[in-house]
Amino acid sequence: MALQPSPLRVAMVAGEPSGDLLAASLLDGLTSRLPAGTQYYGIGGPRMIATGFDAHFPMEKLSVRGYVEALKHIPGILGIRNELKRQLLAEPPSVFVGVDAPDFNFGLEHPLREAGIPTVHFVCPSIWAWRGGRIKKIAKAVDHMLCVFPFETALLEKAGVAASYVGHPLADEIPLVPDTLGARRALGLAQDGPIIAVLPGSRRSEIDLIGPTFFAAMEMMQHQEPNLRFVMPAATPALREMLRPLVDSHPGLALTITDGQAQLAMTAADAILVKSGTVTLEAALLKKPMVISYKVPWLTGQIMRRQGYLPYVGLPNILAGRFVVPEILQHFATPQALAEATLKQLRDETNRRTLTEIFTEMHHVLKQNTAQRAAEVVASVIEKRKGRP
């Protein structure tokens, strides 16, 4: 009687909500590409778990932002990484896929690769935006890099890292022409009149730092445009509670807070005031004028300023290679500055048409059927491993 082959085992780690989205997309592609019975496990969030992923540790334990802010969490995070490394070395997977979270994943991928376990990393860290030798760390840790932006592959291949451009799953998910009126109907918002979506972040540290400034800016804008309304998505009940003191201190605001549905809220808007992050790419794919902002603690900001060499932080500007939307950061992010810039984005119809053209071209470049393309690369890495002597 012939022995049945062991099922494939795909270990994955995602450490952020944006990574959970990317990993869930990849899992959809893998389940249609790899044999039935393939096991998927590791560290993941709710979107991954919804696909049948077995999360050994909660993703939230890794979801910490900022150099200084992360220090107090380091012992717990290292403990999780060491335990997962022990498990994976004891029972090697067919492949390990790290999704974003480079500081955590590269430290795990390196020893796994040294032990002969093939490693794939999904989302190249910003080697094109930061100084330093991170690309050397990538070369030691990663067998194959899945790139979501087209200009990344040449940089990696020059350093000897195999890389494939797979596009960005958000570009597959978001329609080329957003349905603004449909989004307003779905959220119960009025069909006429200007609406600004405001997204101050999802962590307490972010809300504490920039939330009061965003709310003060909203009040200034409404004073200048009395018929203006705002929509703000709260991803979780905990975030809604964090926002409550700010909402209570601005009782006159025409503000609707939605339960999640960030993409729908942005689709419904005429312009967006948004904290820097992946959500700015989502806003660009929705063809929306926007103002990008952030505030981080002083020391974190100094470290970021010294490490970075691109003049912009927002993904729409990085992808365009120039400032196409304003960025107002750190101490420059006053309520007045944000209000003036956001109202200008709202009112300038020529700028709106220009941005629509730029963002539509960007959308076509990023729309690559990412889930299937990424799954094909992972499957090929597994096949190569099978062929090793």
UniProtKB/Swiss-Prot annotation:
One of its GO terms (molecular function) is phospholipid binding. Keywords: Glycosyltransferase, Lipid A biosynthesis, Lipid biosynthesis, Lipid metabolism, Transferase. It comes from Paraburkholderia phytofirmans (strain DSM 17436 / LMG 22146 / PsJN) (Burkholderia phytofirmans). Pathway: Bacterial outer membrane biogenesis; LPS lipid A biosynthesis. GO terms for cellular component: membrane. It catalyses: a lipid X + a UDP-2-N,3-O-bis[(3R)-3-hydroxyacyl]-alpha-D-glucosamine = a lipid A disaccharide + UDP + H(+). SUPFAM superfamilies: UDP-Glycosyltransferase/glycogen phosphorylase. It is an enzyme of class 2 (transferase). Its EC number is 2.4.1.182. Condensation of UDP-2,3-diacylglucosamine and 2,3-diacylglucosamine-1-phosphate to form lipid A disaccharide, a precursor of lipid A, a phosphorylated glycolipid that anchors the lipopolysaccharide to the outer membrane of the cell. The keyword Protein transport does not apply. This is Lipid-A-disaccharide synthase.
